[in-house]
Amino acid sequence: MIVVLDVSAAIEIIFQREKSNTFKSIYNQGTWIIAPDLFIAEITNVLWKYHKAGLISHIDCIQYVQDGIDMIDDFIGTREL
């Protein structure tokens, strides 16, 4: 099954929030995980805001961005979608 991962779902999984089990279940069923190429900018922006708000450290921010990127098998150009 192809899964298109949205940044909000990735954040839920990374931070193991309330809906993370639901998202993880769907994510784990995926044989090909894709996301728009904007995913990288979006997840970086969200996590940078968490860092600026003092919710996560700079080191954690960098690691979580990498974790989010690593969740994706292929990035699809926005124009192709």
What kind of region is each of these model predictions?
Residues 43:
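Entry/capping segment at the start of metal-dependent catalytic domains
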Residues 39-40, 60-81:
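Acidic catalytic patch
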Residues 1-38, 50-63:
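Short, well-structured N-terminal submotif of metal-dependent ribonuclease cores
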